[in-house]
Amino acid sequence: MTPTFEIPKRAMAIFAHPDDVDFGCSGTLASWIESAGTHVTYCVITSGQKGTHDPEVTPAEMAETRQREQRAAGEAIGVKEFVFLGHQDGELERTMALRGEVCRVIREHRPDVVFTNDPWSHYQIHPDHRVAGWSALDGVIAARDHLFFPEQLTGGLKKHRVSRVLLFGTRDPNIWFDIGTTVDRKIAALRAHKSQLGGRKGFAERMRWWAKNTGSTWKLPAAEAFRYIELA
């Protein structure tokens, strides 16, 4: 882990689809929960209802399955709270309405640190991933100032300042977290997504290789890497 990073009391991951968080940062979150008791909230923007090649499965059935799988994956590492915004898979747009939704979730759950997709990542071709990252960052900025979405503050909800952001799926990492003791829990979380990963041979071995390769930069047994942004 470098540079020096204080593990937060509260963290939130904001991401496009069920399973994005488990690929991106579940090993780090599992480590924080285990070592420091960090309270973690997941905010899933879309329902992932297009994530099937089976013509017999309806979008509504897929959405229900993927929400259930994401809850199981989160619970496998100790996540306590889940927010499902229910947007259409593959159709996210960077709108003020979505920014307001994310802003409200941040104000309600009050994380110290937010994880999200890196919207600047080179060759990030999935539009939902780009929009999720932008909307999360836009929401972080909006949540801290009372003149953004002031209607949210009339019922006792208060503005909230996120102090740090960690971007996963980045090509430009500047911080690495040791997940040597939690890589198996990361794999267990990913295995909960049976509709997406069921039956893939060698999956666990590939995940361990990926974590080991990521950690090699800092001579860690296994790691996840992020772009770290400290907010003024």
What are these regions (language model features)?
Residues M1-H109:
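Active-site rim/loop-helix segments in enzyme catalytic domains that contact anionic ligands
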Residues M1-M12, E93-A232:
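Metal-dependent de-N-acetylase/amidase catalytic core
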